[in-house]
């Protein structure tokens, strides 16, 4: 009788634990998750914005291939269900996606390990008479992107300066999302970095915006902000870094030339967000 009593009591105790919040039943064992320790560092630190340079169906096929992937794909005009735009999640956030490639930002490399990638359906650019013409982004696509990006930033406490373009982290290889991506609009929504106009004017110090400045001095500022700048860069490679910065923060002119306005923007950003 006593043995029966203890068996019943043990069964009731186990049943209570099984239904208790924070107790997870596994095959052959039970997990108590009610006490959580602080991780050494959060894995996700960077949010990377891309464009697909293709239509939606082709983009979806490419991003579900074995060679390349992204966590999210946002259609140019997202279909709406129950009044909300639909976004495709292709890789769970806790898993790595192959979206960044060879990349570097703020001293870190292998950014696939520490980032979430969002691909935007967009045709990219077409070249005519030696000039690249970038495709605009649909307003509905940007409106769908905003709550997704806000969600990700809030979950992982991503800093504004770590919301970046693919071109920012791989300027020698990539242009996306290009100069028509509305970085300033997103910054007004709390997504990403943007310089204060008054501070840009302060650092411009009365110079004409396109006054040439020393390239090495500008690159030193960009390196402090987070760009991958190496001492043995060719002039073309130097221009690619400057152009990536300009497409993000001065999209009206992104010729890769070192000028006073680009320098002033870099100084204003460093003042506002700190350096690498």
From Swiss-Prot:
Topology versus the membrane: Lipid-anchor
Lipidation, N-palmitoyl cysteine type: 17
GO BP terms, alphabetized: cell wall organization; peptidoglycan catabolic process; peptidoglycan turnover
Site-annotated residues for Transition state stabilizer: 174
Active site: 119
EC numbers: 3.5.1.28
Entry keyword set: Cell outer membrane, Cell wall biogenesis/degradation, Hydrolase, Lipoprotein, Membrane, Metal-binding, Palmitate, Signal, Zinc
Keyword DNA damage: no
Cofactor detail note: Binds 1 zinc ion per subunit.
MF GO annotations: N-acetyl-anhydromuramoyl-L-alanine amidase activity; N-acetylmuramoyl-L-alanine amidase activity; zinc ion binding
Superkingdom field: Bacteria
Binding site for Zn(2+): 50, 166, 176
Localisation per UniProt entry: Cell outer membrane
Lipidation (S-diacylglycerol cysteine): 17
Family as reported in the entry's similarity comment: Belongs to the N-acetylmuramoyl-L-alanine amidase 2 family.
The protein's name: N-acetylmuramoyl-L-alanine amidase AmiD
Designated gene of the protein: amiD
């Amino acid at each position: 009788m006593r043995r029966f009593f203890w068996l019943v009591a043990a069964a009731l105790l186990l049943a209570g634990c099984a239904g208790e919040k924070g107790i997870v039943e596994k095959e052959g064992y039970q997990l108590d998750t009610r006490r959580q320790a602080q991780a050494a560092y959060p894995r996700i630190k960077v949010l990377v914005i891309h464009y697909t340079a293709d239509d939606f169906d082709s983009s979806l096929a490419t991003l579900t291939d074995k060679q390349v992937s992204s966590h999210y794909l946002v259609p140019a005009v997202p279909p709406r269900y129950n009044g909300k735009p639909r976004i495709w999640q292709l890789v769970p956030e806790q898993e790595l996606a192959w979206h960044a490639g060879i990349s570097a930002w703020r001293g870190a490399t292998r950014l696939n390990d520490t980032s979430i990638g969002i691909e935007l359906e967009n045709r990219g650019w077409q070249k005519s008479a030696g000039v690249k013409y970038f495709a605009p982004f649909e307003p509905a696509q940007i409106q769908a992107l905003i709550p997704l990006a806000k969600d990700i930033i809030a979950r992982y406490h991503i800093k504004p300066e770590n919301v970046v373009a693919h071109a920012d982290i791989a300027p020698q290889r990539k242009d996306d999302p290009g100069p028509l991506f509305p970085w300033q609009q997103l910054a007004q929504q709390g997504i990403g970095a943007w310089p204060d106009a008054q501070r840009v004017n302060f650092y411009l110090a009365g110079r004409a915006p396109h006054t040439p400045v020393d390239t090495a001095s500008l690159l030193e500022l960009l390196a402090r902000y987070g760009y991958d700048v190496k001492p043995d860069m060719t002039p073309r490679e130097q221009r690619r870094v400057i152009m990536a910065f300009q497409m993000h923060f001065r999209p009206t002119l992104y010729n890769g030339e070192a000028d006073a306005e680009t320098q002033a923007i870099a100084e204003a950003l460093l003042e506002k967000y700190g350096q690498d």
